[in-house]
């Protein structure tokens, strides 16, 4: 195979390559076996025509196109590997020469990854708003939330206040006409929770059990039901009950109810503090990592990012998101119906920062290459086991799905991120 690659820009070029006679013969054999099944010739049963007779009647050239289709993918991949390039999109392939008895010559217009000129990526100074410190107030807030979760709702005769729960029947209408989904009975609603349309809950503050009130609201302009968006509505609402939270005593007994692993309130507070310290430390490290990566990307220079890479990233992100939804039992159709959005909306959402994601990946890849990381078999095995546990899949299935080269690439990317983050200094 003869291969050459000539760049026409930083991200485009022409790949010229040939297909040798032995490979062509293999392709012709495959092509003949495929097309002969549909050929009927007097003196032969359908599909039983000999190769010699076929060539005599139609000429071997009649098989060229099918033969090329059979061998082109492998030949193109081999040419790409020999040229040492990384195409990022489907090529536009043209046949330069296709004659009987000669090697076939082809050209492919390819889009390749852009050149990345790295700047500083180690020992970067970054600023982050996150902190690892845990205040007494944060511990008390966690404790209060746990106390609220164990509160009992007790019926009260007095007027509803913010934070109370009202049990209501309601019928909604727009211009005097009831609409689908606008009716409910014995619905429990915590006032101030923001569960209902803005303005609804506020109008129930001060009501008592047995009262019926008219609640007037306006649906938000971006409301998921387009026929209601921006319209004024009237909800005739009957308050059946008003309930107030009765908080349990904050003592050792409650501490044991909240967490069976502790014996006292002080032990619970200490445990909450430790958990908060761990979560804040993780958030802090994530913030440092993000800031350091952004700085490393800003220090690098990439002349041009091909549109094809942007499109590929958008579709990759969309497929990953929708695939995650399907794992939760939500089909794409169901997701778009629930959210009141469309595939175009999701495309625009991921398109907004696709350039940043592609640019970041390119810089991290370049850093991994500059550091010349090596990956051991033990690291690959550990990565496979980690992924198997993460996605609840057998190790053998992960091994079949993910090529070793891809796993090594991902491990190298993680090592590059670690270099950027662990050497960074916070102002």
From Swiss-Prot:
BP GO terms, sorted: 'de novo' cotranslational protein folding; cell division; chaperone-mediated protein folding; protein transport; protein unfolding
Reaction(s) this enzyme catalyzes, per UniProt: [protein]-peptidylproline (omega=180) = [protein]-peptidylproline (omega=0)
Top-level taxon in the UniProt lineage: Bacteria
EC number: 5.2.1.8
Record-linked Gene3D superfamilies: 3.10.50.40, Trigger factor ribosome-binding domain, Trigger factor, C-terminal domain
Subcellular compartments: Cytoplasm
UniProtKB keywords: Cell cycle, Cell division, Chaperone, Cytoplasm, Isomerase, Rotamase
Gene Ontology CC terms, in alphabetical order: cytoplasm
SUPFAM superfamilies: FKBP-like, Triger factor/SurA peptide-binding domain-like, Trigger factor ribosome-binding domain
Gene Ontology terms, MF aspect: peptidyl-prolyl cis-trans isomerase activity; protein folding chaperone; ribosome binding
Predominant location: cytoplasm
Domain PPIase FKBP-type: 163-248
The keyword Cell cycle appears for this protein: yes
InterPro entries: PPIase_dom_sf, PPIase_FKBP_dom, Trig_fac, Trigger_fac_C, Trigger_fac_C_sf, Trigger_fac_ribosome-bd_bac, Trigger_fac_ribosome-bd_sf, Trigger_fact/SurA_dom_sf
Function noted in UniProt: Involved in protein export. Acts as a chaperone by maintaining the newly synthesized protein in an open conformation. Functions as a peptidyl-prolyl cis-trans isomerase.
Similarity comment: family membership: Belongs to the FKBP-type PPIase family. Tig subfamily.
Written domain comment of the UniProt record: Consists of 3 domains; the N-terminus binds the ribosome, the middle domain has PPIase activity, while the C-terminus has intrinsic chaperone activity on its own.
Protein name per Swiss-Prot or TrEMBL: Trigger factor
Lineage, highest ranks first: Bacteria, Bacillati, Bacillota, Bacilli, Lactobacillales
Gene that encodes the chain: tig
């Amino acid at each position: 195979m003869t291969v050459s690659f000539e760049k026409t820009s930083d991200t485009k070029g022409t790949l010229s390559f040939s297909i040798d006679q032995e490979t062509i013969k293999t392709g012709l054999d495959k092509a003949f076996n495929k097309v002969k099944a549909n050929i009927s010739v007097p003196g032969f049963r359908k599909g039983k025509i000999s190769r010699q007779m076929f060539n005599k009647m139609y000429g071997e050239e009649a098989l060229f196109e099918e033969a090329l289709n059979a061998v082109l993918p492998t030949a193109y991949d081999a040419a790409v590997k020999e040229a040492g390039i990384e195409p990022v999109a489907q090529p536009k392939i043209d046949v330069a020469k296709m004659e009987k008895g000669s090697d076939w010559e082809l050209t492919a217009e390819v889009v390749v990854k852009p050149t990345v000129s790295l700047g500083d990526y180690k020992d970067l100074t970054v600023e982050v708003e996150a902190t690892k410190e845990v205040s007494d107030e944060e511990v008390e807030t966690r404790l209060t939330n746990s106390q609220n979760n164990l509160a009992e709702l007790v019926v009260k005769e007095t007027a509803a206040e913010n934070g109370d729960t009202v049990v209501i029947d309601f019928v909604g209408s727009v211009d005097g006409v009831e609409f689908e989904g606008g009716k409910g009975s014995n619905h429990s609603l915590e006032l101030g929770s923001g569960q209902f349309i803005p303005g609804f809950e506020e109008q129930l503050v001060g009501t008592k059990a047995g009262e019926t009130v008219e609640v007037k609201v306006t649906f938000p302009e971006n409301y998921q039901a387009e026929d209601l968006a921006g319209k004024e509505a009237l909800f005739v609402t009957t308050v059946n009950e008003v309930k107030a939270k009765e908080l349990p005593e904050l003592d050792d007994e409650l501490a044991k109810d909240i967490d069976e692993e502790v014996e006292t309130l002080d032990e619970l507070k200490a445990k909450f503090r430790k958990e908060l310290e761990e979560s804040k430390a993780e958030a802090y490290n994530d913030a440092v990592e993000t800031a350091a990566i952004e700085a490393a990307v800003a220090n690098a220079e990439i002349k041009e990012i091909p549109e094809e890479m942007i499109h590929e990233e958008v579709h990759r992100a969309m497929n990953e998101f929708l695939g995650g939804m399907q794992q939760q039992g939500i089909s794409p159709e169901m997701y778009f119906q629930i959210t009141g959005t469309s595939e175009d909306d999701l495309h625009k959402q991921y398109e907004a920062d696709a350039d940043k994601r592609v640019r970041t990946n390119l810089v991290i890849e370049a850093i991994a290459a500059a550091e010349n990381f090596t990956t051991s078999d033990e690291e690959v095995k550990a990565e496979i086991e980690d992924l198997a546990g993460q996605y609840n899949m057998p190790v053998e299935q992960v091994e079949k799905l993910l090529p070793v080269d891809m796993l090594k690439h991902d491990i190298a990317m993680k090592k590059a991120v670690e270099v950027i983050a662990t050497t960074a200094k916070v102002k």
